[in-house]
Structure formats: C-alpha cells, structure tokens
Amino acid sequence: MDLLYRVKTLWAALRGNHYTWPAIDITLPGNRHSHLIGSIHMGSHDMAPLPTRLLKKLKNADALIVEADVSTSDTPFANLPACEALEERISEEQLQNLQHISQEMGISPSLFSTQPLWQIAMVLQATQAQKLGLRAEYGIDYQLLQAAKQQHKPVIELEGAENQIAMLLQLPDKGLALLDDTLTHWHTNARLLQQMMSWWLNAPPQNNDITLPNTFSQSLYDVLMHQRNLAWRDKLRAMPPGRYVVAVGALHLYGEGNLPQMLR
C-alpha cells in the first residue's frame, strides 16, 4: 500500500462526515473513488427529493452501485415453495408473540400459515416500517435508481434480488433465527429505524464509530452483515478505475465489521 494512499485514508478519517446525509468517502488504490451512502430501503415523504449535492455526486460518477436494483417490477417472493403449518415450525411462545404483533400491525395470522419463516420476518419488518410512515418509493436506493436512469448512468448490482433470495433460502432452520430476532427485538427495531431516518432528516452520525443496538444473533449477523460486507468489499476492490456512488443499507456503514473498515 503506497504512502499517498495511506495519507489520503487518514485524512478522510480525520475529517469525519461533512455531508448532510450518512456517507463515507473511500479511495482505493488504482484511482477508484467510492462515495458510500447509508441507504434506507423504505423512506418517508420528507426524504424526497434527494439532496441536490448528492444528485450532483451521482451526475459526476461513472456508475451507481446498489445491493439490488429495486426499481424493477419483478416480485422477488414469487414461486416460493409452500411450507408446513406454522404451528409445526415454531414454539408456542413464538407463535403467541407472532399473533400479538400481527394483531398490532393489523395482519391476519393466516397470511403466514405456509410462508417461509424468513419471509414472515421480512413482511413484519416492512409492515412495521409502513406503520412508521415509510414507503418503498421514498427509499434512498429507489430514488437513486430513478435519478441514475434519468441521467443515463450505468447501474451495477452488488448481489441482485435473486442472490438475496437464494441467501435467505439457505438460512438454517428456514430462517427461524431471523423470525425469532424480529419478534424479540421488535421495539428496538422500531427505534433503530427511526434513528436511521433521523440521519437523513436531521443530521448524520459525525463519528463513524457509533454504537448501535444489536438486533441480530451472532450467527445471523455473520450471514446477513459480515459475510455480505466481505463479498461487497471484494467486488468494490475489483472495480475498474473511476468514481462510484455506492448505496448499501445504513447498518453496513457503521458498527462492528462495517464495510468502510473492510475497505480501508
């Protein structure tokens, strides 16, 4: 690693975040510059339009990089195999918690009767976000994708929706840990979501070493966060020289084993 790269990396770390949105600039050897954005996949009306300065960064970039292109009309949950009755897959306590939260969210528990456990968890999380006033069309990555198409910018996927579904299908016990964590940390998840919204509506974290509540078990954190960060790191390192706007979930930017740390 050359001296100039070390100096640039240190200087960027000392400057901290000087944007009005959660973002970290990373310069890699070989003249590769990435503007990493902490995206929220569902947003509020107040989170649109995107900051003018961010749109200018996108305009000056060679490409937009996202986890998956969510602007397509494809339904990622189509053609999933039906599962056995829910009562046979989770404990009585988990079933009671699920029924309580479903009632709170206005969801009929029968909707979940034959769905994979990881899908139930994701439906609950999406419904919780909707109850907080969030909508997919105001999500940061969705807005960036729309802007990229208007600017005729190439869009590069870090993994794509099909790979994301494949990862979820491979979770142990068909995603039981994800459902259990969702039920156990239900209120913490809501507070964390509101905290991430505030990074866009009010002010982003000024200290990249902020501590966030842990709402994943260690095994689940390794699959959904750590292993994905490693794969994304390798893909970003393999990009050709250029300037890129990179939108990943906000939790991938901060906390233990975050993506910026892996890239530095």
Curated annotation (Swiss-Prot):
One Pfam family hit: TraB_PrgY_gumN
* Highest taxon in the source lineage: Bacteria
**CDD domains associated with the record:** Tiki
- UniProt protein name: Uncharacterized protein YbaP
